[in-house]
From Swiss-Prot:
NCBIfam families: PRK05170.1-2 (NF003499). It holds the Pfam family CxxCxxCC. It comes from the Bacteria. It comes from Haemophilus influenzae (strain ATCC 51907 / DSM 11121 / KW20 / Rd). This is UPF0260 protein HI_1355. Belongs to the UPF0260 family.
Length: 154
């Protein structure tokens, strides 16, 4: 997430995701860190379900929701996936609070989003961060840490 000092006001309302600059694209991230929590897929076909867990990437700062080494994350965590304008349609697993997903679905940003509130602390203040996260290196049984099963693959 970047500072929005050099960004056009309300750019997310006037530009499509494809029209955004790299700075605007990065500024959309609210810093909740939910995309850095592990997901578990069970079943196949129409019965395939996605489960969200409290298991975080080892680089995630559990208190702030920020990556501990953002610039090198792809070199350190081999399964870290870069969200881009081209692959966004493949990221149906993003949380329903994610700005990228919301804008892709034609929805508005929530009041607590830093671009709306003007505060980088609004995500934490709105209680959006996952509580009681645990790093992947400290987990033996993933099933103990499932927190949601709200998605069925299409």
């Amino acid at each position: 997430m970047q500072s929005n000092m050099q960004l056009e006001p309300n750019f997310w309302q006037t530009k499509s995701l494809l029209e955004m600059t790299e700075s605007e694209w990065e500024a959309l991230c609210d810093g909740c860190g939910k995309c850095c929590y592990r997901k578990y897929i069970q079943g196949r076909g129409k019965r395939q379900k996605l489960y969200y867990t409290r298991i975080a990437c080892n680089l995630l700062d559990l208190e702030t929701g920020k990556c501990g080494n953002y610039s090198e994350r792809f070199n350190i965590e081999t399964d870290c996936t870069k969200l881009t304008k081209k692959n966004l349609p493949d990221f149906h697993w993003l949380p329903d609070t994610c700005a990228y997903r919301l804008l892709y679905e034609g929805k508005t940003l929530p009041e607590w989003h830093p671009l709306i509130s003007g505060s980088p602390h609004s995500v934490k203040n709105a209680d959006i961060l996952i509580k009681n996260g645990i790093h992947e290196r400290d987990v033996i049984d993933w099933f103990e840490f499932i927190i949601d099963e709200d998605h069925t693959f299409k």
